[in-house]
Amino acid sequence: MPDFIYLASQSPRRLQLLEQWGARCELLLPDDQEDAESLEAVLPGEAPAAYVQRVTALKLAAALDRLRRRGLPPAPVLCADTTVALGRRILGKPQSSTEARAMLGDLSGREHRVLTAVAVGQPAGRASRGSRSWSALSVSRVRFGVLT
């Protein structure tokens, strides 16, 4: 049994949290030729919870494939994705400061949800037939004060 996990996330905060908990992590980041951003495209009519769970599952599948392609030693792989939802509207990463100000204006004085999906995958080993995975969803309600 390995004494570390792979973290398939570019979030410095996720790595910091795991290290604070005493977890030994190895980063398992996408190759330059991987189109990781395309995994985050919102499907028409997709609800926020379904979206964040689907994206996390796709990221986990890509990370497990990356692990296999690179010939790295098998160990659990952790992936996560977080999104903000205002009603059924999924707020993606703002592409400009103007878009960021508009999003903050939309959130001002209102309640929104922060949804985080987490998935852990165990790669297929010699003794098992295939990889296994587990997932969870956390939903937090946040109320913004009025921004002026």
Briefly describe each language-model feature range.
Residues P2-I5, R13, E19, V42-T148:
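Anionic-ligand binding patches
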Residues C25-A36:
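A short beta-strand-loop structural module common to alpha/beta enzyme folds
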Residues W21-A23:
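Short, structured coil segments at secondary-structure junctions
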